[in-house]
Design a protein with these regions (language model features):
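Conserved catalytic cores of phosphodiester-cleaving nucleases, focusing on short active-site segments
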Residues: 433, 455-472, 486
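Mg2+/Mn2+-dependent nuclease catalytic core
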Residues: 168-173, 472-489
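A short acidic/basic microdomain associated with nuclease active sites
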Residues: 436-450
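Short beta-strand or tight-loop elements
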Residues: 451-455, 497
Length: 521
């Protein structure tokens, strides 16, 4: 069995530790060169959790501390000549989660203390904003060089309570106070870098820093974090080959599997494909493809929001949106779309420059399967053993193209769903239908547009395309007739596959499928 060529820094986010210990590092220092050449002073970057933000922040810290030896052989080594040593204040707020006001104040106190030990503290500096301002000014005075402030995961203290107004207000006031000196400290600052997941406009960062560059949606920074397809197929190719060998695949087959599981992120209109770095590195190191990112912890705030806004997973694929509908503050949102995008559960799939319209979708199989697993208890039987038994029989029927048997399995299973989990809308049954088929890893799309309407679901099999129409308390014949009347089959006539239309009737009283009609087109 082929050996792993690269030594991967699994769980390590400190640049100096990676470089000093010979761990594999994908050079991202060209982006620091770009910052310096453009004389950028305040930069904000939004990316999902575990996507490399902290490593990039650590890289910036090492650069501004003038640690030239760590950058030998990297892009910035050819650019930087002076390697000035600036005082760097690096605040990591990722640990400030699930806190009340007292705990958050204590956390900020512990973050400030090391710098006060280094640069001193004056009487009267009591509140975090006063202490931060004093530290920066003294650091500048004592070293003769402007300070650098790095704030990693600036929004972490607020995300878990974003849906709880009473709890959010006191925490937001504390963080607003902490960040408030940044604007007036401009004469003492060389650079300020802030990372997070979403935007809280009232935290003074966005409302007061007029020269803040939010690079989150810029094409040139789309791969500032994460791993691009080019980086995988060049620097990491030997280990992808080794993974393929371990899994009994060719390199091309392994690359396809890695792409399906971990690729698909796009952070701008013309973004290159970006792989989830956490999952990709874990997979190459462990020689196993698994849901590492999703399995590392779905944020509780996300599940609460999915519940609050009654998210229909079926509607997330192919969601059309203008920029302001997903690039907005979580405090201003009226649905879950902004947070789903900013948290990495949706990504940009397509951009129409004429209408400035984005098409959003779930990035890859890891995220899709993870969302399905998280949401299915809200729609079907919470008992995992019952779900597994049903899915096994259902799966076998679908894969042998026996839709009759598959729907019979579904009818029996749906009758067991607890009544209190249900509502009786057509959307609800459509979502259950979508969840069932999606678990089989079949390519299924819901509400697919035709020239004069939308099919409820389209399922692509190797030799057959199924078009489904679902009706609640109406006949299966009516559902079948709508497929013909609306021309739902027309887009697929040129594909050379067998075309089958399926009309399904749900009985809201019996809480299951009452009838279906299957007809080849």
């Amino acid at each position: 069995m082929a050996k792993i060529v690269n030594k991967y820094p699994v769980g390590i986010q400190t640049f100096s530790k990676i470089r000093e210990n010979g761990y594999f590092y994908i050079d991202k220092t060209q982006f620091i060169v770009d910052f310096r050449e453009k004389q950028m002073s305040y930069v904000f970057l939004s990316r999902p959790r575990r996507f490399g933000k902290s490593l990039f922040a650590s890289t910036l810290q090492a650069y501004f501390e003038g640690r030239k030896e760590l950058f030998e052989g990297l892009a910035i080594a050819d650019y930087e000549k002076e390697w000035v040593k600036h005082p760097v204040l690096h605040f990591d707020l990722s640990g400030a989660k699930h806190f009340d006001a007292d705990a958050l104040n204590n956390y900020l106190n512990l973050e400030l203390l090391p710098y006060e030990e280094l640069y001193g503290k004056r009487e009267g500096e009591i509140y975090p904003n006063e202490r931060l301002e004093g530290i920066v000014k003294r650091a500048y005075k004592q070293t003769g060089e402007k300070a650098v402030v790095i704030i990693d995961e600036y929004d972490a203290p607020l995300l878990d309570v974003v849906h709880e107004k009473e709890n959010l207000q006191p925490l937001r006031r504390i963080m607003q106070n902490f960040y408030s000196p940044l604007k007036k400290l401009d004469p003492y600052l060389e650079f300020c870098f802030i990372t997070g997941i979403t935007k809280f406009p009232q935290l003074s960062i966005f409302s007061e820093l007029n020269n803040l560059d939010n690079i989150s949606l810029f094409d040139q920074y789309s791969a500032i974090c994460g791993i691009s397809k080019t980086e995988l197929t060049t620097q990491m190719k030997p280990d992808a080959e080794a993974l393929g060998e371990a899994l009994g695949m060719t390199y091309e087959e392994c690359l396809k599997e890695l792409t399906q599981f971990y690729d698909g992120y796009h952070f701008s209109e013309k973004s290159e494909d970006v792989f989830n770095p956490f999952s990709l590195v874990k997979a190459l190191n462990a020689r196993k493809i698994a849901p590492y990112w999703f399995g590392s912890g779905t944020p509780s705030f996300l599940l609460k929001l999915l519940d609050k806004y009654h998210v229909n997973l079926a509607s997330l694929e192919g969601q059309e949106a203008v920029l302001s509908s997903f690039d907005q503050s979580t405090e201003e949102m009226t649905d879950a779309l902004p947070l789903l995008y900013q948290s990495g559960y949706l990504t940009i799939k397509k951009y129409d420059p004429m209408f400035r319209e984005y098409t959003l979708g779930i990035p890859n199989k890891e995220v899709r399967d993870g969302l399905l697993n998280s949401l299915i208890p809200h729609y079907v039987n919470p008992r995992r053993s019952d779900n597994d038994a049903f899915l096994l029989g259902f799966c076998k029927a679908v894969y042998r193209n026996d839709i009759e048997a598959a729907l019979e399995h579904m009818r029996t299973y749906m009758a067991t769903i607890p009544y209190d989990l249900e509502n009786h809308s057509e959307k609800h049954y459509q979502t259950i239908f979508y969840l069932m088929f999606s678990f089989l890893n079949i390519y299924i799309r819901t509400e697919v547009k035709s020239a004069i309407g939308r099919a409820d679901a389209v399922m692509h099999m190797p030799d057959t395309i199924y078009v489904f129409e679902l009706k609640v308390d109406k006949s299966a014949e009516e559902a079948l007739a709508q497929i013909d009347e609306k021309g739902y089959m027309l887009p697929y006539h040129a594909e050379g596959k067998r075309l089958v239309k399926v009309g399904i009737s749900f009985d809201s009283t019996q809480r299951t499928i009452s009838d279906w009609k299957i007809k080849e087109d």
